[in-house]
Amino acid sequence: MLLRTKLLALAISAAFLVLPAGVSAESGFLADVDDLPLAPGLVEDPAARVVFDKPVGRIVEAAASGAVSAGAVTRFYAQTLPGLGWTARAGDAWVRGDEVLRLQVEQAGPPVIVRFSIAPKK
């Protein structure tokens, strides 16, 4: 009985150690933009990251991909970005303060690829 209780406690502890990592990966943010979430199912490509800090503002390029539809990704950002202070502009552009965010969603087949670009307004 004591052994069964210890094994149960160990299993529950292990579940709590693993669960936060899975939740974090599923609801992650871009590595270089801590307030720009990744749509569910997307994983950032570390090789695509480029960041420059300039006196006039930052320039960030990033990409993510996943087995999701382009429509689901577009809907996610259309619903999420306004709550983060971004205002939709023509095409794929969003504006917040002195920055412009561009989202390019490409689906030539699985996976969908999303390219993020943040630059100062001109």
Segments predicted by a language model, with ranges:
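Bacterial N-terminal signal peptides
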Residues: 9-19
